[in-house]
From Swiss-Prot:
Post-translational modification: Binds 1 heme c group covalently per subunit.
Gene3D superfamilies listed in its UniProt record: Cytochrome c-like domain
Stated role: Electron carrier protein. The oxidized form of the cytochrome c heme group can accept an electron from the heme group of the cytochrome c1 subunit of cytochrome reductase. Cytochrome c then transfers this electron to the cytochrome oxidase complex, the final protein carrier in the mitochondrial electron-transport chain.
Keywords associated with the record: Electron transport, Heme, Iron, Metal-binding, Methylation, Mitochondrion, Respiratory chain, Transport
GO molecular function: electron transfer activity; heme binding; metal ion binding
Localization of this protein: Mitochondrion intermembrane space
SUPFAM superfamilies on file: Cytochrome c
Modified residues (N6,N6,N6-trimethyllysine): 78
Protein name: Cytochrome c
GO annotations of cellular component type: mitochondrial intermembrane space
Organism: Pichia kudriavzevii
Binding of heme c, residues: 20, 23-24, 86
Length: 109
């Protein structure tokens, strides 16, 4: 996959609303939905949001979430963590992933 490059947080916010927000919240104290709240994700490993029921695959994967790993994961989640229950086909365009990850970095702090 293409390496992560800083993108547009504004475009990333739109992508989050249209592609992620139906299953995830990202603000501090946001509830878990179908997927876990993503606040603080960049200081965690996969399968570690408190109070969320993960698949064993996510817990075992031990992915440390940083810009490059998040971008790679979002390209094809089921290939990156086989057995994940995240029902998302992925973002194929590197630019979209860069924008989304740039937004997530800011919004999840």
């Amino acid at each position: 996959p293409a390496p992560f490059e800083q993108g547009s947080a504004k475009k990333g916010a739109t992508l989050f609303k249209t592609r992620c927000a139906q299953c995830h919240t990202i603000e501090a104290g946001g509830p878990h939905k179908v997927g876990p709240n993503l606040h603080g994700i960049f200081s965690r490993h996969s399968g570690q949001a408190e109070g969320y029921s993960y698949t064993d695959a996510n817990k075992r994967a031990g992915v440390e979430w940083a810009e490059p790993t998040m971008s790679d994961y979002l390209e094809n989640p089921k290939k990156y963590i086989p057995g994940t229950k995240m029902a998302f086909g992925g973002l194929k365009k590197a630019k979209d992933r860069n924008d989304l990850v740039t937004y997530m970095l800011e919004a999840s702090k």
